[in-house]
């Protein structure tokens, strides 16, 4: 659906230049929700705006539905943009027009007959669950309702792709939840490919199939959302994941850990176990006690939801005779869970 090849974007002013996108390569599949996350200034907005050529790339190519959009002239580009819609953080509704008229605007520009416009607008109002708001003005709507109107307007010409530029950043938590649920439903019902940028990892984990993390104009990491959350590789990815799920070792534990199990007598491993899906039903902690005469004390545990998957994360201190806890670690490493040895500590120090 979308292929980005060797993309670069450089801003030049007088004698200075600023490279904001450097050799970006990625592919977005038809019908998926793809997230792009990064800190402010990382280049994510520039990348999104290149996808409809609101920003002209300095180098590289972009293919959407097998068309190289970077080669299109102005007339071809106007036609192409019907296929790629966009929604924004601040809605961009016209205050002088009511909801019906805001949604109708792109249809009017295309010269669609009024009877067809009326039918299409009310279809869209039903689709975004605002059937009774046709005559309301933007100032009479909540933030979530304004974004629903913006989404309806974006869908007026039946686009193949919807670009979302921080569409939930200005919303309260309840409205954010509603907009994300709407986007997910539109993705499934319409087969709509959605590319969204955000600085909120919570948004990514709730609706994105895959995610790319951008740092200083480059892709630092990319993969399936669940994989990225459970096993982040890049430091910037780990920092984002820690803002969304509790994977960071608490400071009061971290400062007591030793790297070497032989640093002191009677030191025992502190481990992080991550379960997801059916793996969470396995009585692994009980098995450690039953099979190896070792004790697994739970220091911290929490349950998260990532892409409709239940994920459990537990930090445990495994104590017992050295041979027993070593056997327990070997057992854990062979189970269908993620095991990470965080360090070692004495039984009375945790």
From Swiss-Prot:
SMART domains the UniProt entry points to: AAA (SM00382), NIL (SM00930)
Molecular functions per Gene Ontology: ABC-type D-methionine transporter activity; ATP binding; ATP hydrolysis activity
Pfam families xref list: ABC_tran, NIL
Annotated TM spans: none
CDD domains found in the cross-reference section: ABC_MetN_methionine_transporter
Record's keyword annotation contains Translocase: yes
InterPro entries: AAA+_ATPase, ABC_transporter-like_ATP-bd, ABC_transporter-like_CS, ACT-like_dom_sf, MetN_ABC, MetN_ABC_transporter-like, NIL_domain, P-loop_NTPase
The reaction(s) this protein catalyses: L-methionine(out) + ATP + H2O = L-methionine(in) + ADP + phosphate + H(+); D-methionine(out) + ATP + H2O = D-methionine(in) + ADP + phosphate + H(+)
Protein EC: 7.4.2.11
Keyword list, A-Z: Amino-acid transport, ATP-binding, Cell inner membrane, Cell membrane, Membrane, Nucleotide-binding, Translocase, Transport
Domain of life: Bacteria
UniProt-annotated location(s): Cell inner membrane
Location of the ABC transporter domain: 2-241
Topology in the lipid bilayer: Peripheral membrane protein
A cellular component term, taken from the record's GO annotations: plasma membrane
Cited Gene3D superfamilies: 3.30.70.260, P-loop containing nucleotide triphosphate hydrolases
Positions bound to ATP: 38-45
UniProt subunit comment: The complex is composed of two ATP-binding proteins (MetN), two transmembrane proteins (MetI) and a solute-binding protein (MetQ).
Protein role: Part of the ABC transporter complex MetNIQ involved in methionine import. Responsible for energy coupling to the transport system.
Family as reported in the entry's similarity comment: Belongs to the ABC transporter superfamily. Methionine importer (TC 3.A.1.24) family.
PANTHER family: AMINO ACID IMPORT ATP-BINDING PROTEIN, METHIONINE IMPORT ATP-BINDING PROTEIN METN
Protein name (Swiss-Prot/TrEMBL): Methionine import ATP-binding protein MetN
Record organism: Francisella tularensis subsp. holarctica (strain LVS)
């Amino acid at each position: 659906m979308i292929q980005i090849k060797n993309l670069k974007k450089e801003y030049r002013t007088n004698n200075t230049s600023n490279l904001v996108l450097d050799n970006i390569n990625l592919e977005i599949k038809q019908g998926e929700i793809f997230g792009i996350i990064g800190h402010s200034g990382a280049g994510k907005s520039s990348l999104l705006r290149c996808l409809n050529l609101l920003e002209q790339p300095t180098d590289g190519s972009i293919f959407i539905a097998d068309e190289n959009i970077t080669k299109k002239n102005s007339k071809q580009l106007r036609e192409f943009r019907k296929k790629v819609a966009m929604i924004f953080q601040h809605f961009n509704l016209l205050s002088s027009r009511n909801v019906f008229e805001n949604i109708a605007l792109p249809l009017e520009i295309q010269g669609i007959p009024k009877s067809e416009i009326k039918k299409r607008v009310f279809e869209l109002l039903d689709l975004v669950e605002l059937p009774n708001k046709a005559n309301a003005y933007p100032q009479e709507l909540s933030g979530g309702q304004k974004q629903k109107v913006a989404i309806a307007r974006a869908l007026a010409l039946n686009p193949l792709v919807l670009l979302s530029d921080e569409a939930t950043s200005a919303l309260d938590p309840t409205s954010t939840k509603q907009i994300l649920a709407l986007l997910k439903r539109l993705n499934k019902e319409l087969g709509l490919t959605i590319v969204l940028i955000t600085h909120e990892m919570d948004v990514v984990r709730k609706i994105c199939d895959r995610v790319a993390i951008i740092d200083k104009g480059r892709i630092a990491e990319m993969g399936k959302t669940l994989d990225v959350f459970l096993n982040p590789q890049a430091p910037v990815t780990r920092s984002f994941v820690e803002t969304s799920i509790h994977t960071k070792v608490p400071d009061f534990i971290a400062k007591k850990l030793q790297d070497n199990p032989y640093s002191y007598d009677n030191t025992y491993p502190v481990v992080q176990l991550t379960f997801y899906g059916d793996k969470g039903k396995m009585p692994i902690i009980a098995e450690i006690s039953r099979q190896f005469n070792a004790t697994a004390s739970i220091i911290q545990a929490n349950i998260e939801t990532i892409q409709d998957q239940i994920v459990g994360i537990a930090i445990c201190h495994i104590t017992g005779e050295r041979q027993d806890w070593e056997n327990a670690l070997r057992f854990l490493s062979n189970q269908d869970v993620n095991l990470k040895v965080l360090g070692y500590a004495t039984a009375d120090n945790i």
